[in-house]
Design a protein with these regions (language model features):
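ATP-binding/phosphotransfer module of carbohydrate and carboxylate kinases, centering on a glycine-rich
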Residues: 2, 7-75, 84-87, 107-115, ...
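Conserved A3 ("GATE") glycine/threonine-rich loop of ANL adenylate-forming enzymes
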Residues: 23-24, 125, 148-152
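Hydrophobic "anchor" residues
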Residues: 35-36, 90-91, 161-162
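Residue-level detector of high-confidence beta-strand sites
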Residues: 39-41, 94, 128, 164
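A charged helix-plus-loop insertion that forms the helical arch/lid used to bind
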Residues: 89-102
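Glycine-rich phosphate-binding loop of actin/hexokinase-like ATP-binding domains
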Residues: 139-195
Length: 322
């Protein structure tokens, strides 16, 4: 899918935002005012390979910049579905994509691309987009939970993302469900995203409803016990996070929640009925993301613009020569 949002002057200043999920890879150019100039969507497997994922990623970015005439970005900002070091330089673990674990990805990409490079968890970019788009104040506490191939979690406190000691905070998808033994891609067993995220739905469709497209599972079989259990399991980590943080806002999103027939009202009722009373349960404010696939690109771009403004990234004057 290629979309030209508007005509633009090639002399204007822009950054490249990239959103890499377990399923889809999205890239786009965003000007300094936050306007999306162009975007392109592809499948993530095209940059995922055990031996040469970095080469594939660099080549993909370079090809996009040449083909769409964006050879001179101020920066490139990428959201990975990964656990990332606190200094946002290294990918610790990327369970749903091969070839990215343990890489000092920022230094590699900066050298290969020749421009400042920023990275963060993909869900941090999604939440940043929501905060900017909704005009939520810096003083507010906001948690975001986005359910796609896995379960992404972002925590924003006092205007900054909560990263934890090592940068691994917010791994809500690896919250353990008692008594569950299925092996997760992370190497542990019983992780909630193994039971209540997109990859589990793929398994349910394949094993239980082989004649049904995955996007029609809830529409056709939402009252089946296996899917009712899926929804209940998904509410458990959401309730836990609300009870722990007592946030001003909870933002829920991702492809699973926007599936046709997903029982959203029941899901929200499960959450509200199990949060601690009287607070945070009585007045927790739950907002739903609009699930626009461009949000991750824009959030990545906002992160780059913020980083360039505050000097988070070491500035490099050398422009990309490709």
């Amino acid at each position: 899918v290629r979309t030209q949002e508007s005509g633009f002057d090639m002399r204007e200043s822009y950054v490249i935002g990239i959103d890499i999920g377990g399923t889809n890879f999205r890239i786009g150019a965003v000007d300094d005012g936050g306007k999306l100039l162009h975007h392109h969507t592809d499948r993530s497997f095209k940059i995922s390979h055990r031996e040469n994922s970095v080469d594939l990623l660099v080549q993909y970015i370079s090809d996009y910049l040449i083909q769409e005439h964006f050879q001179f970005p101020r920066a490139v900002s990428i959201g990975f579905p990964s656990a990332i070091s606190r200094d946002r330089q290294t990918l610790y673990s990327t369970p749903n994509l091969e070839g990215f674990d343990g890489l000092p990805i920022v230094s590699i990409l900066r050298k290969r691309l020749g421009v400042p490079v920023f990275i963060d968890k993909d869900v941090n970019h999604l939440l940043l987009y929501e905060i900017v788009a909704r005009g939520i104040g810096r003083e507010k506490s906001v948690v975001g939970i986005f359910v796609g191939s896995g379960i992404g979690n972002s925590i924003r406190l006092g205007g900054s993302f909560w990263r934890g000691k090592h940068g691994a905070a917010g791994e809500l998808g690896h919250f353990q469900l008692p008594g569950r033994k299925a092996l997760c891609n992370c190497g542990n067993v019983g992780c909630v995203e193994r039971y209540a995220a997109g990859r589990r739905l793929e398994e349910i469709a394949r094993v239980n409803f082989p004649q049904t497209e995955i996007d029609e599972l809830f529409l056709r079989y939402g009252e089946q016990p296996i899917l009712e259990e899926f929804v209940r399991d998904l509410s458990i980590p959401v309730v836990a996070e609300i009870n722990i943080f007592d946030p001003d806002y909870v933002i829920l999103g991702g492809g699973v929640l926007s599936m046709k027939g997903f029982p959203l009202e029941q899901f929200l009722e499960d959450i509200r009925s199990h949060t601690r009373k009287p607070y945070p349960g009585e007045d927790v404010e739950i907002l739903l993301s609009d699930a626009d696939p461009r949000n991750g690109i824009l959030g990545a771009a906002y992160s780059a613009l913020e980083g360039l403004k505050t000097g988070v990234c070491i500035k490099e004057e050398r422009r990309m020569s490709i």
